[in-house]
């Protein structure tokens, strides 16, 4: 399938999102679509698949002008879109999720479970994934849910698959499996639009790259004809001299200390400490127990045994409000479900953990609240027309900034960041890193969980590595390398 989008314009109200964008997808190619959050990448693909109607411009498929009325029609015509926000029904089984809306029936009109199971098993095996078809999708890891989405798209016999941040929650092994599937699809003439902020992946798996900025097409190039620095410059319109800002740590006293922390079947006897002004990175493979440990420290899933000390005093953290009272903030890996109330305003989201400070007499002082929110929006350079804009309508990078603003507002002693830049563009990543430096300069102790090794190496003063629920090693900034971390993460010494 050959797709040609030419001179595309699209506005939402007064907001001009796309201005004269052109994009071409050739048969059997993997084409990267890159740009900062808000550049218009997802909007362009939503126009292609019929979710939105374009204002002007043309879309040609195999030389014929074609416009779909909705995504289902696009799917029926061979174009599947795997969104960054997974379209998973958590209470339904893996099998039901794979066939929802396109169930197979026998000649008598009954559901043909036998055939559906066989097809589902075949597709998951093709992806190299082992998941019980009877398991509820909500009980699957985020990585497994992502694989279910990919399998669902492949089962439609799509000729074009749009993948929006497909590896954001996948392990290294799962990424390699996905790349193997992409290469096989490519050989069979399937075209892939690959939307990602992970530059290493783009240069590994893609044939061409189109860069967008501020709703316009900047350039399209073959991967061998460009490099990381050129792409970043075209994305942000400026040089990013260093990927990670320089750190000059000056650690103070121990603020957070965890001793012999255990949760049955998840992690065992983990001890570590974090000092004021320090960033401690926590690395390990998906499923190692990193996030679960942080959730326990924050009181979301309390420890079975072990102790937590804040500034030398034992703290009973049985629920998140206990942690907040002790000065702990937690930015979760899943900002959409746990970090934000999507259908409320930026103002309400930022103010939420801080309501007590605006309500000394039992009612909210609206003026104080607004001044507080405006200050944080300005400080974190959150791009929005109004504090009353719903969080759902922000780009990924700006949503993450709102989550960070929410917790900065409590004046934390300890800030836990779980995958702080997942799904965030290069420019916004650097802003988040600079903010982390500002916080540590003010004495905040930061614990950062990340699956991106360059991020761990670029921002951590110390690195803790977790393997299968145990602390397998601790490395200083000078001793930490990708090879050393991966050795410890896979059980080596």
From Swiss-Prot:
Catalytic activity annotation: D-ribose(out) + ATP + H2O = D-ribose(in) + ADP + phosphate + H(+)
Record keywords: ATP-binding, Cell membrane, Membrane, Nucleotide-binding, Repeat, Sugar transport, Translocase, Transport
Signal peptide: none
ABC transporter domain mapped to chain residues: 3-239, 252-493
Binding site for ATP: 35-42
InterPro entries, sorted: AAA+_ATPase, ABC_carbohydrate_import_ATPase, ABC_transporter-like_ATP-bd, ABC_transporter-like_CS, P-loop_NTPase
Gene Ontology terms: cellular component: plasma membrane
Membrane topology value: Peripheral membrane protein
Domain of life: Bacteria
EC code(s) of this entry: 7.5.2.7
GO MF entry, a single one: ATP hydrolysis activity
Family: Belongs to the ABC transporter superfamily. Ribose importer (TC 3.A.1.2.1) family.
Function: Part of the ABC transporter complex RbsABC involved in ribose import. Responsible for energy coupling to the transport system.
Subunit structure: The complex is composed of an ATP-binding protein (RbsA), two transmembrane proteins (RbsC) and a solute-binding protein (RbsB).
PANTHER family noted in UniProt: CARBOHYDRATE TRANSPORT ATP-BINDING PROTEIN MG119-RELATED (PTHR43790), D-ALLOSE IMPORT ATP-BINDING PROTEIN ALSA-RELATED (PTHR43790:SF3)
Protein name, per record: Ribose import ATP-binding protein RbsA
Taxonomic lineage of the native organism: Bacteria, Bacillati, Bacillota, Bacilli, Bacillales
Gene: rbsA
């Amino acid at each position: 399938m050959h797709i040609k989008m030419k001179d595309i314009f699209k506005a939402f109200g007064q907001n001009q999102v796309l201005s004269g964008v052109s994009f071409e997808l050739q048969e059997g190619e993997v084409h990267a679509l890159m740009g900062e959050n808000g550049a218009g990448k997802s909007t362009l693909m939503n126009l292609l698949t019929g979710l939105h109607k374009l204002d002007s411009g043309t879309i040609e498929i195999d030389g014929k002008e074609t416009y779909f009325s909705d995504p289902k029609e696009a799917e029926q015509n061979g174009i599947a879109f795997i969104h960054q926000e997974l379209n998973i029904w958590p209470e339904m089984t893996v099998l039901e999720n794979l066939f929802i809306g396109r169930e197979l029936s026998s000649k008598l009109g009954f559901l043909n479970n036998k055939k559906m199971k066989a097809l589902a098993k075949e597709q998951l095996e093709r992806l190299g994934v082992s998941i019980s078809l009877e398991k509820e999708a909500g009980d699957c890891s985020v990585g497994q849910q992502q694989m279910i989405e990919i399998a669902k798209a492949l089962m439609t016999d799509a000729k074009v698959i749009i993948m929006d941040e497909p590896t954001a929650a996948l392990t290294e092994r799962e990424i390699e499996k996905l790349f193997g599937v992409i290469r096989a699809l490519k050989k069979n003439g399937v075209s892939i639009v690959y939307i990602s902020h992970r530059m290493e992946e783009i240069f590994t798996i893609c044939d061409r790259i189109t860069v967008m900025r501020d709703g316009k097409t900047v350039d399209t190039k073959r991967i061998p004809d460009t490099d990381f620095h050129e792409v970043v410059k075209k994305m942000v319109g400026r040089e990013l001299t260093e990927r990670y800002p320089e750190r000059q740590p000056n650690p103070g006293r121990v603020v957070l200390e965890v001793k012999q922390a255990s949760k049955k079947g998840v992690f065992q006897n983990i001890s570590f400490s974090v000092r004021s002004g320090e960033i401690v990175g926590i690395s390990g493979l998906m499923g190692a127990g990193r996030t679960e440990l942080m959730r326990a420290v924050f009181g979301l899933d309390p420890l079975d045994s072990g102790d937590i000390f804040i500034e030398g005093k034992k703290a009973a953290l049985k629920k998140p409000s206990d942690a907040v009272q002790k000065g702990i903030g937690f930015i979760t890996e899943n900002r959409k479900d746990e970090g934000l109330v999507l259908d409320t305003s930026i103002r309400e989201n930022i103010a939420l953990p801080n309501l007590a400070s605006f309500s000394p007499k039992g009612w909210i002082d609206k003026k104080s609240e607004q001044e507080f929110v405006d200050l944080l929006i300005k400080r974190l350079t959150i791009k929005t027309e109004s504090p009353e804009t719903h969080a759902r309508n922000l780009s990924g990078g700006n949503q993450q900034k709102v989550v960070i603003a929410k917790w900065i507002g409590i004046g934390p002693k300890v800030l836990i960041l779980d995958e702080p830049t997942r799904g965030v563009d290069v420019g916004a990543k650097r802003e988040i890193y600079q903010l982390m430096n500002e916080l540590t300069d003010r004495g905040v102790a930061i614990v950062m969980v990340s699956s991106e090794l360059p991020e761990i190496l670029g921002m951590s003063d110390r690195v803790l590595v977790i393997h299968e629920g145990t602390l397998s090693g601790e490395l200083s900034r000078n001793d930490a390398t990708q090879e050393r971390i991966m050795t410890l993460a896979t059980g080596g010494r």
